[in-house]
Amino acid sequence: EFPKYDSITELDVYCNQNNKSDVQMYNFITKLESEYGNITVTVYKGSKTISNDKSILNECELYFVFNIGSNKRVVCLADNKTWDQSLKYWNSSKYPYPRWCDEYLTESEFVRSIGEYKFHVNNGTVKYWEKYYNFPDMVFNYSDKKHDLRIGSLDLETYGDNCFELGLGNLNVYAGGFALNDGFKKLYYLNNDTELNSGEAIIKKMFGDLFDYIAEDRKARNNYTIYAHNLGRFDSVFIIRSLCSEGYKINGQWIDNSILYLKIVDSTRKLTIKLRDSIKLVPHSLDKALSSNGCNISKGMFPHKFVNKDTLNYIGDKPDIKYYVDENKFNESKLKKYKSLPSILNLKKECLNYLDKDILGLLELMNKVSLTYFNEYKLNITKFSTLPSITLNIFGIRFYDDQNSIKMINGPLSEFIRSSYFGGNSDIFVSGEERLVKNGYHYDMNSQYPYAMLQSMPTGNPVFSTNTDLNYYRNGFVFARVTPPSKDTLVNLFIPRRSDDGSVICDRNTFYEFIPTPDLKQGLEYGYKFEVICGINFPDACGNGELFSEFVNHFYEIKSSSTDLGQKYIAKLSLNSLYGKFGQKEREYSIRLLEKDKAKEIISKNHYSYMSEVSDNYTLIKSGGRLNSKLRRLYAEQARINTINDDLLSSKFIKSRGIPSAVQISAMISSYARTSINPFKNIPGNLAIASNTDSLILRKPLEDHLIGKEIGKWKLEHKFKNGVFVKPKLYCYEDVDINELIRKASGVTASNLTYENFVELVNGKDVLTNKELFRLNWETLNIEIVNINTKISGIKE
């Protein structure tokens, strides 16, 4: 309970002016009133001292009341012996004793501010309280003045050691090559009669030649960035294993069970090569990326599954097409390409031709991408490991207005917001015989997430509050008791919740969940009821389009109208890669290759962990990532870590500071994306059959005004017949225009399933299928491809 607003003024006025200290006090107050002009100061006498230390506060406590206008005042607690050391800080957070500010609202209501807290008091009872936070702004890289042209490419070819199964078994390197921008290129092929008698020997020779070449002109060639397509979970494994005993210093970055980049240093000659994963910047197959960017070089065709230790020097009849293309990927285009190949195969010659195309094609691709990013945005791709990271910096350098500041939130608030961060809903809304759909329409929304980015965003600092009024939360996140509507009111539910096993469902029963305000407000319109318990509000949230409209409009215009394939490709990637970066949770780790004795010593003293025993003498270790240096400095300036004392938050979130991020932006964009599709799930007379994040399957067509090329409009992907809808991401139908069976099957190879298999699943029968599985063991640095059988359980209704 709190005293009334005027309770302090009911105390006795302190008026003792019989000693020198009191005279000085009143002179100070008079001077202060004169300087400010709009304040009056009254001193009241309390009944206690403000410390048990009698040597410091040996007289009475005093309340210095600074009246500011007619409805606001600051109260500073001091005593008549030490006031002169503290009162000069009366209007500052540096004030050393209790201090608060009261704002008069009505006869019974006032707001008391104490530090970061505000208590809203009515008749002596706190209605709700708020805690105000002050987090640092998001930081971005600076643009580059000089284009870094030191770019190269690298590729390794492998075969499976299981000669009786096509392409299966443990993978072994048998060929490799690299190419640099200045024209230097070399290819290597396994030959048991030469020094290149193993995959490790090939890799050692490759990097030995590279470093020797760099040493010839160190000034021009040092610090090359060499790209490999799928470095993170493929090439890097063989490279680390092969170079561990060659005397190179190897370190890099690791995230999400994949290596982001490797830095290989020849310490003796002070030479450095950086390896980056091109698939992290260009997230498509090399074949698709080359064609999408209008590259002159196209990927060749090669019988990977025909290669084993006994066929490396094969010269003879061209193998069957199954060695070139997986059976489930056969099509007319691939068949035509296969038929155009020579009837006689010289495997070594064709491998080197194929390898040559791969490294030169990748080099052409990365040069095109590099040129576009530098010419358009003055950024060197060689500084970035991922597409989201470079897109984030494009936004920061080119489009970010710091008047709408994005805060890097950490600790309990970050975890609160992250708990409300859901992806798009994936649902099947039919059951029983309705799973067999005679006719229907499959629609996709144009640029759903960029469309969501055009809405109001949670910019500025957050405020945690126990306010239970729905209208209080303009833009934010709440923890609430949710009561869904009956099926008569709303057939297809859409407010998500996490079940005990971690899965996301839309429940018909009452539940508690963390919810963004767009979901909450839309839910109210469709019959949901909410009882808010607490939440996070962003009072300085920007208006619609103020944060991202320039970014979205810029790239959408390029995507829609540019004739430059490279720019068009980058625009499409940029539109869809930015939002998730704000909410990145995965911590980046540093990795280091060390001699075992040194590794043990470092692990015992630092936050490193064992990763792999690379050889008898060397160990690969990893350590938890550190914050960006700019962020570390910003957080160091904060006097203390913000915490929340509320029991709900303390018990669940207070244990860890978490990783600073702007997860509020990602969570809000994801919420807007969900609300953009939800209304179409319950169209009267045309209820949805199924939906995914940005797609919708209906029995009847959408109205014409909803269809178009504009952002946020719908486009018809398939008009179909004979649909079978088993469960989310497991369905099929026949496209009526191309007479092709369209199959979706998450977790298995969809093309291995027949129409009859889907019908069996709907009828409750289990279906057995198989798929090739890529297994990477980081402890042993071993890669294996295996064929496994998988059972898909039938629907039991």
Swiss-Prot record:
It comes from the Eukaryota. Its EC number is 2.7.7.7. It is found in: Mitochondrion. Keywords: DNA replication, DNA-binding, DNA-directed DNA polymerase, Mitochondrion, Nucleotidyltransferase, Plasmid, Transferase. It is an enzyme of class 2 (transferase). One of its GO terms (molecular function) is DNA-directed DNA polymerase activity. InterPro entries: DNA-dir_DNA_pol_B, DNA-dir_DNA_pol_B_mt/vir, DNA/RNA_pol_sf, DNA_pol_palm_dom_sf, RNaseH-like_sf, RNaseH_sf. It catalyses: DNA(n) + a 2'-deoxyribonucleoside 5'-triphosphate = DNA(n+1) + diphosphate. One of its GO terms (cellular component) is mitochondrion. Pfam families: DNA_pol_B_2. GO terms for biological process: DNA replication. Coiled coil: none annotated. Belongs to the DNA polymerase type-B family. This DNA polymerase requires a protein as a primer. This is Probable DNA polymerase. It comes from Agaricus bitorquis (Pavement mushroom).
